[in-house]
Design a protein with these regions (language model features):
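Receiver (REC) domain switch-region micro-motif
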Residues: 16, 25, 105
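Structural motif corresponding to alpha-helix initiation and N-cap regions
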Residues: 9-11
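Short amphipathic alpha-helix with an adjacent loop that forms part of the alpha/beta core around
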Residues: 13-20
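N-terminal Rossmann-like dinucleotide-binding module
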Residues: 1-4
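Predominantly a Rossmann-like dinucleotide-binding segment in NAD(P)-dependent oxidoreductases
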Residues: 71-76, 81-179
Length: 179
């Protein structure tokens, strides 16, 4: 097997996306690079698979949709929490009727990282937190909303013959992060 090509640096992905022998770019970088890498890949004729969150705001979301439609390239958002053992087992039980007819479901993903603020990924010696914890400290709310929503949507067959009509999100006083 040939040795894997390595691309590095802030814009290293641009060279990767220009290759003719690649059909799909799988994006599992820090969150702030998901969008620019996806756009570059589709602009260069590649299909895209992006870990969540795929974008950081609604403007970027529509830009991905528009680029996918313009280039006719797939842009698939990946939600790895749909495929862990517990979630797959629960989905199987729901599909087998173990719970009866599922008519209401509730999901959440709570990942308090404050105990790790001094022991997590760093971007260099001067970096106190690293990109992941920096984001958690500066923002409130569920930064991985699809982790809780994805498995529930699968169990309810959302977009497989059913769809969400009301969607409710709640917020309480901040325990960690921005007040």
């Amino acid at each position: 097997m040939p040795k894997a090509a390595v691309y590095s640096g802030e814009k290293g992905y641009e060279e990767l996306c220009k290759r003719d022998d690649i059909d799909l770019v799988y994006i599992a970088t820090d969150w702030l690079h998901h969008f620019p890498v996806a756009m570059c890949a589709m602009e260069n004729g590649k299909n895209v698979a992006i870990e969540v969150p795929s974008v950081m705001n609604l403007k970027e979301c529509w830009a991905l949709v528009d680029m996918s439609e313009k280039t006719r390239k797939h842009c698939m958002i990946l939600e790895n929490c749909c495929y862990d053992w517990f979630e797959m087992n629960t989905l199987n039980m729901a599909q087998q009727g173990v719970f009866g007819e599922v008519i209401r479901a509730q999901g959440a993903y709570i990942h308090n990282l404050s105990p790790f603020w001094n022991h997590y990924w760093k971007n260099g010696e001067g970096d106190k937190l690293g990109w992941r914890l920096d984001y958690n400290m500066k923002h409130r709310g569920d930064v991985y909303a699809t982790h809780g929503l994805g498995p529930v949507a699968q169990a309810l067959d959302i977009h497989r013959g059913d769809r969400m009509q009301p969607l409710v999100a709640m917020d309480t006083k901040s325990v960690v992060g921005k007040a």
